[in-house]
Regions:
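N-terminal cap/lid segment of alpha/beta-hydrolase-fold proteins
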Residues: 1-24
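Active-site glycine-rich loops that stabilize anionic/oxyanionic intermediates
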Residues: 34-38, 111, 245-246
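Conserved alpha/beta-hydrolase
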Residues: 42-72
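Alpha/beta-hydrolase active-site loop
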Residues: 78-97
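Alpha/beta-hydrolase fold nucleophile elbow
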Residues: 100-111
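Alpha/beta-hydrolase-fold enzymes
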Residues: 117-204
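Short beta-strand/loop motif that positions the catalytic acidic residue
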Residues: 241-243
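Catalytic active-site module of serine/aspartate enzymes centered on a nucleophile-bearing elbow/loop
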Residues: 266, 270-304
Length: 304
C-alpha cells in the first residue's frame, strides 16, 4: 500500500513523499532518492517488489520535482542549494527513524540521487545507516569541475531559476551518442521503449533544469569527490555500486569503478560493485529489471 506524506521543506514550500507499507511488521526501511527531472512514483514497481519482501519504503520528491513543485511553479530548482535539498532528504530519514527506531535502514540513491546519497555518506557518517546502494552514479574529473562551476555561476547571475537549454545540452547532450539508431533523445535511459515513451509523455519528467540546479549538482559532485570528505565516511558501512554498462552517466562503467576505487582508498571496508552489460542508465527500468531487483534484495539481506 502506498500513502502520501507532506512536510515542510528546509528551502521553501512543502515536500511530498511516499511511503510503501508491507503487510505485517516491516523488517527494514529502504529510503529511495530519485534523480533529476523525475518523481518518486516512477519507483512504484521497485518499491512494491521490496514491500512484498517485507520492507518499508520511503522516498520524497525533491524541491522543484514531482508534487514538491510549489506555488511558485518553478521546476528543477533547489531553493537554498544542494545542501538544503539534502536536508529535505535527511528530514524524511529522521522522521522515519523516529517512528521505526529499531529497524535497519538502507539508503538507495539513483543518478542525481546517487550523488545526494554520497553527500549524505560524507556529511552525516553517524546518521545510523545499515547499508547504502549507489545506482547509476559517475565520477567527474576534479580539475574540470571548478571551471565548469564558475561558468555556470556567471550564467546564474542573470536568473538561476529559469530553465537553461544550453547548459542542459552541455551536461546531457552527448548521452545518446552511443545508442545505435535512437528513436528519441532519451533512448539512453533504457532499452525498454515503453519506459522511454512513458518518460517523454509525462509532464513531470524530462523537463529542462534551471541553471541553478545544474550549478548546485556540480557543486555537490565536487564535494563528494574531495579526499577529506570521502575520508569522513563511516568506514564500516557496506556500500554497493550498481550501474549499466551502457550508461553514459557512468560513463559506461568507468566512473562507477573509479568511485568504488576511491571509496576503498578512503578506507571503506565493504565496497561491492556490479555492472550490468548492455544496460543503460535506469537499470531499475531495464528489460532485465527483475535481475537487478533480485540482486539488490540479496545484497541487502546479507546485512539484516
Amino acid at each position: 500500500m502506498r500513502t502520501d506524506i507532506w512536510y515542510d521543506s528546509k528551502g521553501t514550500g512543502r515536500i511530498h513523499a511516499c511511503r510503501w507499507i508491507p503487510e505485517g511488521q516491516p523488517k527494514a526501511v529502504v529510503q529511495l532518492i530519485h534523480g533529476i527531472a523525475e518523481f518518486v512514483e516512477r519507483y512504484d514497481d521497485f518499491a512494491n517488489f521490496l514491500t512484498r519482501q517485507g520492507f518499508l519504503v520511503v522516498a520524497e520528491d525533491h524541491m522543484g520535482h514531482g508534487q514538491s513543485i510549489n506555488g511558485d511553479g518553478i521546476r528543477g530548482y533547489f531553493h537554498g542549494g544542494w545542501f538544503t535539498a539534502i536536508e529535505d532528504s535527511m528530514q524524511l530519514m529522521k522522521d522515519t527513524k523516529a517512528e521505526f527506531p529499531e529497524l535497519p535502514y538502507i539508503l538507495f540513491g539513483h543518478s542525481m540521487g546517487s550523488f545526494m546519497a554520497r553527500t549524505i555518506l560524507c556529511k552525516y557518517p553517524d546518521c545510523g545507516l545499515t547499508a547504502a546502494i549507489i545506482c547509476g552514479t559517475g565520477w567527474q574529473p576534479a580539475f574540470a569541475l571548478p571551471a565548469l562551476i564558475k561558468v555556470i555561476d556567471g550564467i546564474c547571475k542573470k536568473d538561476e531559476t529559469k530553465p537553461n537549454e544550453k547548459l542542459q545540452g552541455m551536461v546531457f547532450g552527448s548521452y545518446n551518442k552511443k545508442v545505435e539508431h535512437p528513436r528519441t533523445e532519451f533512448d539512453w535511459l533504457s532499452r525498454d521503449a515503453r519506459v522511454v515513451d512513458a518518460y517523454i509523455a509525462h509532464p513531470l519528467c524530462g523537463f529542462t533544469a534551471s541553471a541553478g540546479l545544474l550549478r548546485d549538482m556540480m557543486k555537490g559532485i565536487y564535494f563528494i569527490e574531495q579526499k577529506q570528505n570521502l575520508q569522513n565516511m563511516n568506514k564500516t558501512l557496506p556500500v554497493f555500486f550498481i550501474a549499466g554498462g551502457d550508461d553514459p552517466v557512468g560513463p559506461y562503467g568507468k566512473g562507477v569503478r573509479k568511485a568504488a576505487e576511491e571509496f576503498r582508498k578512503a578506507g571503506m571496508e565493504d565496497v561491492s560493485i556490479r555492472i550490468y552489460p548492455l544496460c543503460r542508465h535506469e537499470i531499475l527500468n531495464e528489460i532485465n529489471r527483475e535481475e537487478v531487483y533480485e540482486d539488490v534484495l540479496h545484497w541487502i539481506e546479507k546485512y539484516l
